[in-house]
Structures are given as structure tokens and as C-alpha cells.
């Protein structure tokens, strides 16, 4: 997949910011740097870069852009112990709001090894819950939830969703002319997705792990 001049320039900006600042730019910063009217245009180009294999994006992080391909392989990766077929080795990628949406900006290189039986479908990563808006679904503050990476979800499923650059876990409700994200705690109000917001499904909730605390 060939990159456009704009996409090549965005890739160069990402590499430069990682090199100079140690962190990638946010979608808002990319939009501002290239004169886009909003983050939707930046999101479009980032999706193209990801499809081309030039970057990968880490769900659950506001600055979750990572270089891929030759640039990524230049960094030495730590050796990993083999994992049995009946267990999962899952990365803990950040935090997700079970409350008001938050910028999910806490990265982690931690991994958790656990039995596959805890999850259905099989998760791709874990996120740490912050808040209690999903209390009545048995999801509590501090839980680690498994997330199955997908862009597709049905009304009535619990999803991890991104609104602009914020991440939240909620019950998805798709109406005739609107999308809402519903809490499972009467102390919280539903979130209605507005037409001008950058909204995407990051994955499906597929189980949880409750650390000892």
C-alpha cells in the first residue's frame, strides 16, 4: 500500500517526536500540525498508516502510536518464556474509564499469564478499570478486563469505545438515529455520541481478572 505525501509527512512527524520527546504526538497535535479541521482527518491518515504496516496503535492509550516495520524491529525485544497452549500471556496496555471517559494515557509493559477459561472470546489485551459505572455488571474499580480487539459490535454488548481521544467501557446501545454508551450504575448518566465526535469501537469486553487488593 503506497502512502500519500501527507501520510509520509505524518509518519516523519511521529518518528521525529518519538526521537526528540520520547513520546508520539496525539491525534489533536497531528491535526494542528497539518492544519486539519479536526481529529477525524488525522484518524483517517493514521488508519492508513496502520493498514500499511508503518505504525501500530495501542488501545487504551491517548498517545498510543508506535512505529512498526523496520523502525520497530531495530529495538531489541526481551526474550519471552514459552507459554502453554491452555494459558494466555496478555499485555496490560493501560486504563479504561468505568465512569466518565478519561484519556487513557498510562502505558505499561506488564504481562499477566492466566488460564484461557476466564475469557470468552479470547482477549488480545487487558485494561485496568478506573471507576464504578459498570458496577451492576460486576465490573469494579481496579479490575483488569479482557478486551477482544474488533471494530464490530452489536447493540447490547459491553464494549471498550473511544470518543475522540478518550477511552471508556460501557454497554453499547444502537438506536435508529443515535448511538449511546450506557453505564450500569444509576449514579451515572448515559453518554450520547455526537455526530461531530471521533467515535470508534476498540474491542469487546470478554471477562475480567480481579487482582488481590
Curated annotation (Swiss-Prot):
BP terms from Gene Ontology: DNA repair; DNA replication; negative regulation of DNA-templated transcription; proteolysis; SOS response
GO MF term set: DNA binding; serine-type endopeptidase activity
Domain of life: Bacteria
List of catalytic residues: 133 (for autocatalytic cleavage activity), 170 (for autocatalytic cleavage activity)
UniProt entry tagged with the keyword Repressor: yes
Keywords annotated in UniProt: Autocatalytic cleavage, DNA damage, DNA repair, DNA replication, DNA-binding, Hydrolase, Repressor, SOS response, Transcription, Transcription regulation
InterPro entries: LexA, LexA-like, LexA/Signal_pep-like_sf, LexA_DNA-bd_dom, LexA_repressor, Peptidase_S24_LexA, Peptidase_S24_S26A/B/C, WH-like_DNA-bd_sf
Site (Cleavage) location in chain: 98-99
Catalytic activity, EC: 3.4.21.88
DNA-binding region, residue range(s): 27-47
Catalytic activity: Hydrolysis of Ala-|-Gly bond in repressor LexA
Assembly behavior: Homodimer.
Similarity comment: Belongs to the peptidase S24 family.
Task of the protein: Represses a number of genes involved in the response to DNA damage (SOS response), including recA and lexA. In the presence of single-stranded DNA, RecA interacts with LexA causing an autocatalytic cleavage which disrupts the DNA-binding part of LexA, leading to derepression of the SOS regulon and eventually DNA repair.
Protein name, UniProt field: LexA repressor
Organism per entry: Xanthomonas campestris
